[in-house]
Amino acid sequence: MLRWLRDFVLPTAACQDAEQPTRYETLFQALDRNGDGVVDIGELQEGLRNLGIPLGQDAEEKIFTTGDVNKDGKLDFEEFMKYLKDHEKKMKLAFKSLDKNNDGKIEASEIVQSLQTLGLTISEQQAELILQSIDVDGTMTVDWNEWRDYFLFNPVTDIEEIIRFWKHSTGIDIGDSLTIPDEFTEDEKKSGQWWRQLLAGGIAGAVSRTSTAPLDRLKIMMQVHGSKSDKMNIFGGFRQMVKEGGIRSLWRGNGTNVIKIAPETAVKFWAYEQYKKLLTEEGQKIGTFERFISGSMAGATAQTFIYPMEVMKTRLAVGKTGQYSGIYDCAKKILKHEGLGAFYKGYVPNLLGIIPYAGIDLAVYELLKSYWLDNFAKDSVNPGVMVLLGCGALSSTCGQLASYPLALVRTRMQAQAMLEGSPQLNMVGLFRRIISKEGIPGLYRGITPNFMKVLPAVGISYVVYENMKQTLGVTQK
């Protein structure tokens, strides 16, 4: 069908200027099923599918958003032809950006090279899968005609869009702060899309964390109070919190957890860009290892900056009703009774937890990505929303599992000054005490509610993130 499209709609360059309007008119008439001189979205959807023309995700809606100049919900022939001409210019630029050796063909090695400049590494075998979805004649190269035919009615015109499916972040926020920052392309940085995406992610994180705050507070309570002698389970923990402070107490500490999103994201993003510059030469691609090191160091920098808020979040969550009137009161009392050093209790295990979390999170995601591309990417490199969310959630969960003992010790160090009769132990002392009294399972107290919040957090943050991207103009509605 792509061959038919090339011969029928898109003539050779020699006669293109003379015949193109006629060819476009013939295609327009084929789409205009009722012959009223305009094409609505229903006719476009049905016509393109009948012609076997490949479409991207939500392609018809995006075509109408771009091409429907007078916003009457229909495309007349002039709008239709203008859209195709403008779109073809963009496709030509995208093709040239990929054709590194200017031989008029795109090869697998050129796709690998282009993605490397964007900070994304794939194998040549995976690049061949991208080619297979576009290549018509089986040469394992894509010429301009094949490229144009494939993306004629596909709003994806940029190589960055093609591989953006597999960016590690999809707007997921499961409440942790140790993930490696997003990788933004040069175009996103220049156009200002990067800050819109960060803002959308921040809002999604705020909604997601607020929605799952009761489970987060329960996790903290079980980390601090759970032991063999005081077996706090999920239902008992919720009953105890509601009995002590009412329904509203389930969200105690959430305000701090939400407020810290903005400064943490800003510092992490800035630090990540600086560390990348230190670890790579100008214009050089950033590999997976350099990305891991840069991301880990950026996470450590951001955590150093906002760590006092982490301590206050724990103190507010563990505190009893009336103990603190708010964030400011909590900070004032900690400073008065324990001094400035109290704001960094648990800082060492928190920093140590970044390495296993970020490393395993990134490694598992890359492993899942490679497995899907090698085994399931038959006709398209787009894995779909469910696969992306599943990979992101699973990799984050594995990272949490590896770093959880350090997170538990961090939380106990943050809160132990509040517990009457509790000795003020350092990290090593707490590890020894927990293992001797509670065994290895003691290092995983509270992990059940932590895992319980993953699925709702993923779903909520993704939905909010996608809607906010539309609102902020990152994606078309």
Swiss-Prot record:
Positions bound to Ca(2+) 4: D135, D137, T139, T141, E146
Annotated Ca(2+) 1 binding sites: D32, N34, D36, V38, E43
Molecular function via GO: adenine nucleotide transmembrane transporter activity; ADP:phosphate antiporter activity; ATP transmembrane transporter activity; ATP:phosphate antiporter activity; calcium ion binding
SMART domains: EFh
Membrane topology, Mitochondrial matrix segments: 216-252, 310-345, 407-445
Intracellular or extracellular location(s): Mitochondrion inner membrane
Protein name: Mitochondrial adenyl nucleotide antiporter SLC25A24
Parts of the chain that traverse the membrane: 198-215, 253-272, 296-309, 346-365, 389-406, 446-465
Ranges of the Solcar repeats in the UniProt entry: 192-278, 286-371, 383-471
Annotated Ca(2+) 2 binding sites: D68, N70, D72, K74, E79
Comment block on domains: The regulatory N-terminal domain/NTD formed of two pairs of fused calcium-binding EF-hands, binds calcium in the mitochondrial intermembrane space and regulates the antiporter activity of the transmembrane domain/TMD. In absence of calcium, the apo form of the N-terminal domain is intrinsically disordered and binds to the transmembrane domain, inhibiting the transporter activity. Binding of calcium leads to a major conformational change and abolishes the interaction with the transmembrane domain and the inhibition of the transporter activity.
Chain positions with N6-succinyllysine modification: K320, K437
Catalytic activity field: Mg(2+)(out) + phosphate(in) + ATP(out) = Mg(2+)(in) + phosphate(out) + ATP(in); ADP(out) + phosphate(in) + H(+)(out) = ADP(in) + phosphate(out) + H(+)(in); AMP(out) + phosphate(in) = AMP(in) + phosphate(out); phosphate(in) + ATP(out) + 2 H(+)(out) = phosphate(out) + ATP(in) + 2 H(+)(in)
Tissues where this protein is expressed: Expressed in all tissues tested. Highly expressed in testis, expressed at intermediate level in small intestine and pancreas, and weakly expressed in kidney, spleen, liver, skeletal muscle and heart.
Job description of the protein: Electroneutral antiporter that mediates the transport of adenyl nucleotides through the inner mitochondrial membrane. Originally identified as an ATP-magnesium/inorganic phosphate antiporter, it also acts as a broad specificity adenyl nucleotide antiporter. By regulating the mitochondrial matrix adenyl nucleotide pool could adapt to changing cellular energetic demands and indirectly regulate adenyl nucleotide-dependent metabolic pathways. In vitro, a low activity is also observed with guanyl and pyrimidine nucleotides.
UniProt keyword annotations, A-Z: Acetylation, Antiport, Calcium, Disease variant, Membrane, Metal-binding, Mitochondrion, Mitochondrion inner membrane, Repeat, Transmembrane, Transmembrane helix, Transport
CC per GO annotation: membrane; mitochondrial inner membrane; mitochondrion
Organism per entry: Homo sapiens (Human)
Region (C-terminal transmembrane transporter domain): 174-477
N6-acetyllysine modification, residue list: K320, K336, K437
Residues of the EF-hand domain: 19-54, 55-88, 86-121, 122-157
Pfam families: EF-hand_7, Mito_carr
Mitochondrial intermembrane side: 1-197, 273-295, 366-388, 466-477
